[in-house]
């Protein structure tokens, strides 16, 4: 399974990229707003760091297909690695159809049902982003959605890739891998958590203590 980092924070992106564990980045209007920087400025800097798919979303206030198509073309023109993130709506699907026909990669976001994922795939989406954590928040098993979409896409041979989103903890990542997600887009803090295990820490401390006992510092 491939990993993307889910953030617009350039420093976190650099740290994740330096580990060699990510091959893409996802952003959204909330993450961009959190940084308090110009969208194009942030995206251009991200493309200079990570050589892989970079998802940039149309403005949250753009709700019509015509507007999404216009903005999608502008986002795609920033860099060849750009992926246009489109919300799962009727107008969004119209935009995906047009953009995909022009060879522009799209990521349909805010997916909360298998039917939504199927519609997005039929419209030509490059990626679909089902949200685990937000489903878990309302007592619905988010991982079951990943499993359903993966099985359906396998049955019918869809090329659309599944990006598991709204990842809250390392257990989500493991579950997504087992459920068949192609990609997990993960906050940097969760990537850091994934590197840790108490037995690893104990093992390092033991090795260090044994070495010092014989050779000193």
Swiss-Prot record:
Domain of life: Bacteria
Family recorded in the similarity comment: Belongs to the transaldolase family. Type 3B subfamily.
UniProt xrefs under SUPFAM superfamilies: Aldolase
Entry protein name: Probable transaldolase
Gene Ontology process terms (BP): carbohydrate metabolic process; pentose-phosphate shunt
UniProt keyword annotation of Nucleus present: no
Pathway: Carbohydrate degradation; pentose phosphate pathway; D-glyceraldehyde 3-phosphate and beta-D-fructose 6-phosphate from D-ribose 5-phosphate and D-xylulose 5-phosphate (non-oxidative stage): step 2/3
EC number: 2.2.1.2
Native species: Agathobacter rectalis (strain ATCC 33656 / DSM 3377 / JCM 17463 / KCTC 5835 / VPI 0990)
Keywords: Cytoplasm, Pentose shunt, Schiff base, Transferase
Pfam families the record matches: TAL_FSA
UniProt GO MF annotations: aldehyde-lyase activity; transaldolase activity
Gene name per UniProt: tal
Catalytic residues in the record: 85
GO CC annotations, alphabetized: cytoplasm
PANTHER family in alphabetical order: TRANSALDOLASE (PTHR10683:SF36)
Subcellular location field: Cytoplasm
Substrates-to-products reaction catalysed: D-sedoheptulose 7-phosphate + D-glyceraldehyde 3-phosphate = D-erythrose 4-phosphate + beta-D-fructose 6-phosphate
Matches recorded under CDD domains: Transaldolase_FSA (cd00956)
Enzyme class, UniProt record, top EC level: transferase
Role summary: Transaldolase is important for the balance of metabolites in the pentose-phosphate pathway.
């Amino acid at each position: 399974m491939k990993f993307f980092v889910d953030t617009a924070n350039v420093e976190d992106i650099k740290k994740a990229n330096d580990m060699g564990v990510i091959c893409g980045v996802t952003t959204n209007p909330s993450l961009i707003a959190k940084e308090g920087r110009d969208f194009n400025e942030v995206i251009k800097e991200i493309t200079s760091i990570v050589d892989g798919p970079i998802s940039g979303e149309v403005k949250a206030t753009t709700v019509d297909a015509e507007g999404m198509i216009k903005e999608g073309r502008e986002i795609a023109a920033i860099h060849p690695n750009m992926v246009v993130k489109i919300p799962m709506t009727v107008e969004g699907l119209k935009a995906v159809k047009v953009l995909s026909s022009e060879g522009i990669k799209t990521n349909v976001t805010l997916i909360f049902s298998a039917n939504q994922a199927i519609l997005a795939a039929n419209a030509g989406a490059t990626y679909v982003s089902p949200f685990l954590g937000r489903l878990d928040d309302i007592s619905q098993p988010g991982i079951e959605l990943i499993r359903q979409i993966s099985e359906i896409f396998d049955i019918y041979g869809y090329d659309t890739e599944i990006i598991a989103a709204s990842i809250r903890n390392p257990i989500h990542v493991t579950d997504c891998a087992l459920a068949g997600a192609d990609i997990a887009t993960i906050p940097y803090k969760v990537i850091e958590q994934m590197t840790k295990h108490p037995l690893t820490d104990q093992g390092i401390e033991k090795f260090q203590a044994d070495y010092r006992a014989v050779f000193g510092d």
